[in-house]
Swiss-Prot record:
It comes from Coxiella burnetii (strain CbuG_Q212) (Coxiella burnetii (strain Q212)). This is NADH-quinone oxidoreductase subunit D. NDH-1 is composed of 14 different subunits. Subunits NuoB, C, D, E, F, and G constitute the peripheral sector of the complex. Its EC number is 7.1.1.-. NDH-1 shuttles electrons from NADH, via FMN and iron-sulfur (Fe-S) centers, to quinones in the respiratory chain. The immediate electron acceptor for the enzyme in this species is believed to be ubiquinone. Couples the redox reaction to proton translocation (for every two electrons transferred, four hydrogen ions are translocated across the cytoplasmic membrane), and thus conserves the redox energy in a proton gradient.
Amino acid sequence: MAEVRNYTFNFGPQHPAAHGVLRLIVEVDGEVIQRIDPHIGLLHRATEKLAESKPYNQTIGYMDRLDYVSMMANEHGYVLAIEKLLGIEPPIRAKYIRTMFDEITRILNHLLWLGAHALDVGAMTVFLYCFREREDLMDCYEAVSGARMHATYYRPGGVYRDLPDSMPKYKPSRWHNEKAVKKMNEAREGSLLDFIWDFTARFPNLIDEYESLLTDNRIWKQRTVGIGVVSAERALQLGFTGPMLRASGVEWDLRKKQPYAAYDRVDFDIPIGREGDCYDRYLVRIEEMRQSNRIIRQCVEWLRKNPGPVMIDDYKIVPPQREVMKRDMEALIHHFKLFTEGYIVPEGEAYAAVEQPKGEFGVYIVSDGANKPYRVKVRAASYPHLAAMNEMCRGHMIADLVAIISSIDIVFGEIDR
């Protein structure tokens, strides 16, 4: 008699719902998943090894490219580790700016996650709405750093520069006439803080729009409720952090438990779920966007009232300002030496972790007293979540696999490193 065996097939690495170069070896019995074996490494770029051959200040840009949806949050973890080794603390204004941009980054991440998650499950409209809001936040990145994604804005000792007094403006083109451009530039007449304040005033109603399309939608709930359940106890055992852990009912958030930057000075709540399924992960991230909006408004109010320095006054670490560097020969040499050779970091080791949008993003640095790190180890926030794919998917239908992958919010820049 012929042996009856399960069917095995490849999911990815070129699948549009794989969220990057993910390859899953899926074993099914009919339509029911029996086993999943994730294969990673297709986006490995040896970031940790590259950091060992570069001065400390030249590796900040690599952090942007790990989780390339949560750029400044990655920078924050790396910069905090260097500041621990150097024994320095940034000015309070720089802390508030970092807090504000960490939360802008959180909203950027969650908007992309929500749009992609909805699209994977079959809801096209939300995807378009989310990218509409992301444009405004990308413009905030561009205003402070000149780049829409890879900002390299956080520096050991503070931030690259203070917030600008004006916003980039749209110009007439073949697609937008002067009347349309004038309307598009209405919110851009003031400073960056004015623009962010205007966005935070509009954003809660926009979140309501997303919820009106999804939260009580019968099809959405059928595709997400009771799918990919992880209990609180099991989530802790698997090393879950961030929204994945909180959706399982564990109230753990580094911003509250181990405050950094200005998080101990702002008021916000930690949303938690009950069931630990795809639907709870959605609800937790939706509420996180509301709380991030609340934090940003508090930061804007404080920054308007409290001008001050955004970088420490230590010329062994901080290069001269560009205006000074272009006028003075000694400042030019100083600037050149710091950016090419960097600075000496005392011997020691430090671990710094931040509550990145996907979970705990940690950076462990070992210094041997040189201008380059002896070893850099990155704790990717979403790595443990992907490792639990087999447990979350077993017993579900093939169609549920896509919903579970998109609910865990993975980016292979940081998983493969």
